Regions:
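Positively charged, polyanion-binding regions of nucleic-acid-associated proteins
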Residues: 2-29
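Long, charge-rich, low-complexity intrinsically disordered regions
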Residues: 2-3, 91-98
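Intrinsically disordered, low-complexity regulatory segments enriched in Ser/Thr/Pro
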Residues: 147-177
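Charged low-complexity interaction tracts in eukaryotic proteins
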Residues: 60-94
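Short glycine-rich, basic-tinged beta-strand/loop micro-motifs
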Residues: 24-44, 98-106
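A cross-family detector of function-defining hotspots
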Residues: 112, 118-153
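Charge-enriched amphipathic alpha-helical scaffolds
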Residues: 28, 38-67
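Charge-rich, solvent-exposed alpha-helical interaction surfaces
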Residues: 9, 13, 40, 53, ...
Length: 177
């Protein structure tokens, strides 16, 4: 279960990166704190135990992403995904991927929360929208569980544009906003 969650998260982050920066067939490095990896594996591993867990990846995962290399400094883990992983993600990103549409919308100055909400609503019924006042963000939007997008999308109106960050629910809870 944990490896499939990790694979999905790695692919989702790479899709987001490619939506923002464009595609290049190159190796990618993604960083995770130990706490996030423990959430993905539903574990309470130490740094050493997590490093041991990440030595061998399932064959179906490496068939998609290539031979991943994992290192760590302290409790910060680095995943190096080879260029074939970048290529796999690029080839499997749909033209109407939600994250791609969101990034393109937020590139535009003058984008409103109403437009962002409409984008969410075009992708699913029952979108949850909360006003939040935690000093970091103004709004939290998320899809219902049935949609299969587990992330909490947090938005901040910076005046001339809106920024966002997305979190897995467990990571969002760790911030204790």
């Amino acid at each position: 279960m944990g490896y499939s969650k990790l694979e999905r998260n790695l692919i989702d982050l790479m899709k987001e990166e490619q939506a923002k920066l464009g595609y290049r067939k190159e190796a990618v490095r993604l960083y995770y704190p130990l706490s996030s990896l423990n959430h993905l594996f539903e574990a309470e591993d130490s740094v050493d135990a997590m490093q041991e867990r990440l030595i061998h990846f399932p064959e179906d995962m490496t068939a998609k992403l290539g031979m991943l290399a994992v290192t760590h400094k302290g409790d910060r883990f680095c995943f190096r995904i080879p260029e074939e992983g970048s290529e796999y993600v690029h080839e499997h990103m749909g033209a109407n991927e939600f994250i791609k549409e969101l990034v393109e919308m937020l590139w535009q100055h003058g984008t409103t929360m109403e437009q962002i909400r409409a984008l969410f609503d075009r992708h699913a019924d029952g979108v949850i929208c909360e006003n939040i006042d935690n000093g970091e963000f103004d709004y939290l939007l998320r899809f219902p569980e049935s949609v299969g997008d587990p992330y909490y999308y947090c938005f901040k109106n910076e005046g001339c544009h809106i920024i966002y960050h997305r979190f897995l629910p467990e990571d969002y809870a760790d911030f204790d906003f």
